[in-house]
Amino acid sequence: MKKIRWVILIIVLIACVILWTQTINVMCDQDVQFFSGICAINQFIPW
């Protein structure tokens, strides 16, 4: 049972990361001032 829990946890974490990066990309496209620093960092991380 514990292995299934770990698999679900990992899948949820991966989904959250994907959603977060998509959100950042949208914010960067709209040129939101608050996200400009995150966008600069985001360009160096190969998502």
Swiss-Prot record:
GO terms for CC? Answer: plasma membrane
- Record-annotated membrane-spanning stretches: 6-26
Topology with respect to the bilayer? Single-pass membrane protein
UniProt keyword Transmembrane helix, yes or no: yes
Key words, A-Z: Cell inner membrane, Cell membrane, Membrane, Transmembrane, Transmembrane helix
Localisation: Cell inner membrane
GO:BP terms for this protein?
A: negative regulation of phosphorelay signal transduction system
Q: Which InterPro entries match?
A: MgrB (IPR020907)
Q: How does it assemble?
A: May form homooligomers. Probably interacts with the periplasmic domain of PhoQ.
Give a short account of what the protein does.
PhoP-regulated transcription is redox-sensitive, being activated when the periplasm becomes more reducing. MgrB acts between DsbA/DsbB and PhoP/PhoQ in this pathway. Represses PhoP/PhoQ signaling, possibly by binding to the periplasmic domain of PhoQ, altering its activity and that of downstream effector PhoP.
Query: Could you tell me which HAMAP family the record lists for this protein?
Result: MgrB
Tell me the protein family, please.
Answer: Belongs to the MgrB family.
UniProt-recorded name of the protein: PhoP/PhoQ regulator MgrB
Which gene carries the instructions for this protein? mgrB
